[in-house]
Amino acid sequence: MPKMKTHKGTAKRFKKTGSGKVKRSHAYTSHMFANKSQKQKRKLRKSALVSSGDYKRIKDMLPK
């Protein structure tokens, strides 16, 4: 059986942690910052973990 290929769009958006969880960045961070509060912008800077339902789909696209 051939090797699984990595889905490159997924690889650019997600990173696996050492324990096997998947990290993601927040949406709404490219423009229109004047309409967002300082607190909201600060929280958007931090990375988040992928939810368990999405993890099942993403893990097949990131074979490594």
Swiss-Prot record:
Superkingdom of origin: Bacteria
Compositional bias annotation for Basic and acidic residues: 54-64
Gene Ontology biological process terms from the UniProt entry: translation
Positions of the UniProt region annotated as Disordered: 1-64
GO CC annotation: cytosolic large ribosomal subunit
Compositionally skewed regions (Basic residues) per UniProt: 1-26
Keywords: Ribonucleoprotein, Ribosomal protein
GO molecular function: structural constituent of ribosome
Family, similarity comment: Belongs to the bacterial ribosomal protein bL35 family.
NCBIfam families per UniProt: rpmI_bact (TIGR00001)
The protein's name in its UniProt record: Large ribosomal subunit protein bL35
Species in which this protein is naturally found: Oceanobacillus iheyensis (strain DSM 14371 / CIP 107618 / JCM 11309 / KCTC 3954 / HTE831)
Source organism phylogeny: Bacteria, Bacillati, Bacillota, Bacilli, Bacillales
Gene encoding the protein: rpmI
